[in-house]
C-alpha cells in the first residue's frame, strides 16, 4: 500500500532541539538532495515548546558538544541563543564544605530563542517544516515503519505522510515509541524509577550578598542535598550577573519517602520555592518576562535518568534525544547527548537511505556509532546515580570530602575507572575514621562501571547477536539494582 511510493525520503517527528539538528545533519550529508520534512505540534513561532508553560530545561550545555556539531555539520550558534558562557560546573556537598568542579567550559542557552535560529538554519538547508500537526502514530507495513499519522490542529483534518525513514524526536513521552506497532528490540516503555520530576524558574534578581557556593556568574552550581532535592539534585545556573535558571529534580519514590518521614505533602514546586528562599544571594526574584523569556519563566517536566534505549533503531525507524532516553543519568543533562546523537543520526540516516536499506540491519550502525561516541558510559552513570540515591547527607559530605576527587568525577563522567583516592582511604583507616560501607559502595560502583563500559564496547555489530548481548547487560544491571535498592 505504501512501500512503492513515498511523500518524503525522511520525516523527522518533533521540531525541538534534537529534531532540527538531525534534519539539518541529514540535509548537510546528503548535499540537500533528500526530501526532508520536520513535523511539530507547535506553530512555527513557538517551535519546539514542550508544554504550555514553555521550553522547560536547565539550559546548560558543554562547549565540547556544541563544537562537535559545528565541526561536523557547520551549524554555529551565537547570541541570543547562547545567552551566557560558563567556565564549568561545581558540585557542592550538603554542608558546602566540599566542592568538585567538572565538565569544563559551557553555555547557558535560551531555549525559546534557539529553535528560531535552528529553524532558519534548517530552512536554508532545504528542509521543509510543518507546524500545528499532532502526530498520533507511525504508519506500518510488512513490519516496517513507512510514515506518520496524526491531526492537523488548524483544520482538524487527518494528517498522513509516508517516507523511507522516520526519526522520532518527540520527547520522553513519545507516543510513536510507546505504541510502536512493529517487532523490534526497542524498549517502548520506561520504568518510573528511571524518571525524575524537575522544575525551574528563570529569575531576574538583586544580589543580597556574595557567596560563591550559592551563586557564581562564572559557574553552574549543583547542590547535592537529600533534604533539598530527595533522590536528585538542585541547581543554580547563571544566565548573567543578575539572572538565573534555578531549580531541582527529584526521584518520586525518594520524594514520597521524604514527605512521609516529615508528615507533609510537598510537590516539586514547593521544594523549589523553599530552595529559592533559602539562597542568601538571591533577593527580590522576579520571573523573567522580557521578549526572549516571555512565556518561559516557570515550568515542570519529567526527565529520564537511565542509559539510552538499549536499541535505537527498527525497520524504517530511529530515535534521537529524549525519545531515546539520552539525558545523562547522573545529572539529567540532555542537550549535549541530543546534539551528538542527532549529528550522528543524520549522517547514518543518509547513508542508509542512499543505500536503499533502511531496515533494522541497515540502520544498526547508528547504535554502534552513538555508543562509541557517548553511549558507552551511560549504564555506568546509571549505576552511580542509583548508588547516590541511597546515601544520606552525612554520607555525601563524607564521600565528597574524603573519596571523590576531581580526577574521580572526571573518570566517572568519561566512563573510565576511578580509583576513589586510595591514599586518602589508607590515611583514614590509620586514623580510625574510615566509612567502610561508603567505601565499599564506591568500589563496587567503580568495578561495575568498568564491566559495563567494556560490555558496551562489545555491542553487537549485527542485530542477530543483540539478545545475547542484552541478556548480559540486564544481568549486570540487576546485580547493581539489588545492591542499591
Sequence positions of predicted segments:
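N-terminal Rossmann-like FAD-binding beta1-loop-alpha1 element of flavoenzymes
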Residues: 3-38
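Predominantly flavin-linked oxidoreductase catalytic cores and closely associated redox partners
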Residues: 15, 25-28, 121-283, 325
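N-terminal FAD cofactor-binding segment of flavoenzymes
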Residues: 25, 29, 41-89
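Short beta-strand to alpha-helix junction loop
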Residues: 57-64, 101-121, 201, 256-267
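A conserved beta-strand/loop capping segment in the N-terminal third of enzymes
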Residues: 67-117
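FAD/FMN-dependent oxidoreductases across multiple families
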Residues: 135, 228-234, 250-256, 260-345, ...
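Active-site-proximal substrate-binding core of FAD-dependent oxidoreductases
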Residues: 325, 347-398
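C-terminal auxiliary extensions adjacent to catalytic cores
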Residues: 387-485
Amino acid at each position: 500500500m505504501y512501500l512503492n511510493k513515498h511523500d518524503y525520503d525522511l520525516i523527522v517527528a518533533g521540531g525541538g532541539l534534537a529534531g532540527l539538528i538531525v534534519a539539518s545533519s541529514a540535509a548537510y550529508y546528503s548535499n540537500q538532495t533528500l526530501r526532508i520534512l520536520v513535523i511539530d505540534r507547535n506553530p512555527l513561532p513557538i517551535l519546539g515548546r514542550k508544554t504550555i508553560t514553555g521550553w522547560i530545561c536547565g539550559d546548560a550545555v558543554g562547549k565540547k558538544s556544541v563544537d562537535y556539531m559545528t565541526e561536523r555539520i557547520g551549524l554555529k550558534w551565537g547570541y541570543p541563543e547562547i545567552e551566557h558562557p560558563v567556565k564549568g560546573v561545581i558540585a557542592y556537598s550538603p554542608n558546602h564544605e566540599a566542592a568538585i568542579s567538572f565538565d569544563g567550559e559551557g553555555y547557558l542557552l535560551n531555549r525559546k530563542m534557539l529553535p528560531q535560529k535552528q529553524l532558519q538554519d534548517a530552512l536554508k538547508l532545504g528542509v521543509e517544516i510543518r507546524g500545528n500537526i499532532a502526530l498520533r502514530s507511525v504508519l506500518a507495513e510488512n513490519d516496517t515503519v513507512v510514515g506518520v499519522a496524526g491531526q492537523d490542529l488548524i483544520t482538524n483534518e487527518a494528517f498522513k505522510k509516508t517516507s523511507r525513514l522516520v526519526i522520532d524526536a518527540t520527547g520522553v513521552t513519545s507516543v510513536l515509541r510507546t505504541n510502536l506497532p512493529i517487532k523490534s528490540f526497542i524498549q517502548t516503555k520506561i520504568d518510573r524509577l528511571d524518571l525524575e520530576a524537575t522544575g525551574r524558574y528563570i529569575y531576574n534578581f538583586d544580589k543580597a550578598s556574595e557567596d560563591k557556593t550559592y551563586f557564581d556568574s562564572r559557574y553552574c552550581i549543583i547542590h547535592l542535598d537529600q533534604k533539598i532535592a530527595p533522590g536528585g539534585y538542585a541547581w543554580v545556573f547563571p544566565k548573567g550577573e543578575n539572572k538565573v535558571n534555578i531549580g531541582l529534580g527529584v526521584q518520586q519514590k525518594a520524594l514520597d519517602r521524604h514527605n512521609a518521614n516529615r508528615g507533609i505533602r510537598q510537590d516539586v514546586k514547593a521544594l523549589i520555592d523553599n530552595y529559592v528562599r533559602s539562597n542568601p544571594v538571591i533577593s527580590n526574584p522576579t520571573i523573567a518576562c522580557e521578549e526572549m523569556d516571555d512565556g518561559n519563566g516557570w515550568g515542570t517536566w519529567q526527565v529520564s535518568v537511565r542509559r539510552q534505549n538499549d536499541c535505537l533503531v527498527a525497520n524504517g525507524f530511529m530515535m534521537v534525544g529524549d525519545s531515546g532516553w539520552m539525558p545523562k543519568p547522573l545529572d539529567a543533562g540532555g542537550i549535549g547527548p541530543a546534539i551528538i546523537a542527532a549529528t550522528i543520526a543524520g549522517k547514518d540516516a543518509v547513508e542508509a537511505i542512499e543505500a536503499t536499506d533502511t531496515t533494522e540491519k541497515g540502520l544498526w550502525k547508528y547504535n554502534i556509532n552513538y555508543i562509541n561516541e557517548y553511549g558507552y558510559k551511560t549504564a555506568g552513570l546509571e549505576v552511580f546515580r542509583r548508588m547516590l540515591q541511597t546515601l544520606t547527607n552525612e554520607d555525601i559530605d563524607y564521600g565528597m570530602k574524603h573519596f571523590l576527587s576531581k580526577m574521580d568525577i572526571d573518570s566517572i563522567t568519561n566512563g573510565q575507572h576511578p580509583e576513589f583516592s586510595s591514599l586518602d582511604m589508607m590515611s583514614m583507616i590509620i586514623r580510625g575514621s574510615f566509612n567502610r560501607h561508603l567505601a565499599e559502595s564506591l568500589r563496587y560502583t567503580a568495578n561495575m562501571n568498568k564491566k559495563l563500559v567494556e560490555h558496551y564496547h562489545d555491542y553487537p555489530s549485527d542485530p542477530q547477536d543483540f539478545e545475547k548481548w542484552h541478556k548480559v547487560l540486564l544481568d549486570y544491571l540487576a546485580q547493581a539494582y539489588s545492591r542499591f535498592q
